[in-house]
């Protein structure tokens, strides 16, 4: 597919999702995304990071899913060069980017719950490599335009990713932060997976700090895997 020339996807995920790529909805996603890339508009994350969440966490390695909404649409300056904050993982940012308010709150709650030191780096790649799928429901965005790529149809694809994981892998720990993410509960088979919900970590939302969400995640992880998840960065 032409899409994978711009946005590499690992063999493990290509095999896991192979029947999706020929379906009309996905061909339409490919068409719309490639048209967006060709336009004068700036698209985040860079195309090489479009499937970064999948490439860092193979389907067989997924233990936790932390679902996000869509990529950060902002930029930061590095040596006078404007760079995207988004890097293809939900809530995560490029290594040298300023830490956004939502991620700051995630780090605060993680420290309060489990004593994990507050990181000065917002790159969550280490979590992904340990089995946490950091998937956004919408995989791309136009610079400075939040939710601008909802029209592309990514949610149909991310829903299929989730449903296939829910069918083939058990049990998973599914962390849904905020009302938008919690709409995905309908996709999750009952009594098969562990669902953990909390308010969105955005400062505009109330109730995330003090929710104990990471205490719940760690408790569930211990029950399933008989060890702690390593949240260090």
UniProtKB/Swiss-Prot annotation:
Major location category of this protein: cytoplasm
Transmembrane segments: none
Subcellular location: Cytoplasm
Domain of life according to the entry: Bacteria
Record keywords, A-Z: Cytoplasm, DNA damage, DNA repair, Hydrolase
Keyword Repeat: no
GO molecular function: uracil DNA N-glycosylase activity
Record carries keyword DNA repair: yes
Catalytic activity: Hydrolyzes single-stranded DNA or mismatched double-stranded DNA and polynucleotides, releasing free uracil
Residues the record marks as active site: 70
GO biological process entries: base-excision repair, AP site formation via deaminated base removal
Enzyme Commission designation: 3.2.2.27
A Pfam cross-reference name: UDG
One CC-aspect GO term: cytoplasm
SMART domains to which the protein is assigned, alphabetical: UDG (SM00986), UreE_C (SM00987)
Function: Excises uracil residues from the DNA which can arise as a result of misincorporation of dUMP residues by DNA polymerase or due to deamination of cytosine.
Family (UniProt): Belongs to the uracil-DNA glycosylase (UDG) superfamily. UNG family.
Official protein name in the record: Uracil-DNA glycosylase
Organism lineage string: Bacteria, Pseudomonadati, Campylobacterota, Epsilonproteobacteria, Campylobacterales
